[in-house]
Amino acid sequence: MSEYITHSRAETVALGARMAGALAPGSLVAFTGGLGAGKTAFTEGLAQGLGCTDPVSSPTFAIVNYYRGPRPLAHFDLYRISTENDLCAAGFYDYLDQGAVVAAEWSENFADLLALEGPIRVDIQHVDENTRRITIEGVTL
């Protein structure tokens, strides 16, 4: 487990891009952290590091946003998904099986189920307006 402190959104994005280089196809990145913590900013960095060029946005209303690239990324918001059937219907396991990196916000809603996938855990805590404490477990940067 490693802990990082970022002092700006740009630093959070850069840390995500750095982590992307350490991810294998089909990796699951399980995020925890409150509203506005920086999960989407970190995911923007993942997308950049994976070579995805489309702008990254929060999947809150879409449930999943898919970004094409040399190493594709599926960005899920699990907040409004309530059952494993809903998770399957949204294509969660299909994306993993196809080799996409899957970034899952609000992963604590399915902690036991996602644990079976051997996730890389990223916890982002809001320290102050610009500072974030980011704990990464399951991959070495």
Q: Where do the protein language model's features map onto the residues?
A:
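P-loop (Walker A) phosphate-binding loop of NTP-binding proteins
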Residues: 32-34
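Short beta-strand-centered segment that lines the nucleotide-binding/catalytic pocket of NTP-utilizing
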Residues: 52-67
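Short hydrophobic/aromatic beta-strand immediately N-terminal to the Walker A/P-loop
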Residues: 28-30
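N-terminal pre-Walker A segment at the start of P-loop NTPase domains
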Residues: 1-18
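Short phosphate-coordinating micro-motif centered on Lys-Gly-acidic
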Residues: 2-3, 48, 82-87, 93-141
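Conserved lysine of the Walker
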Residues: 39
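Phosphate-binding P-loop
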Residues: 20-26
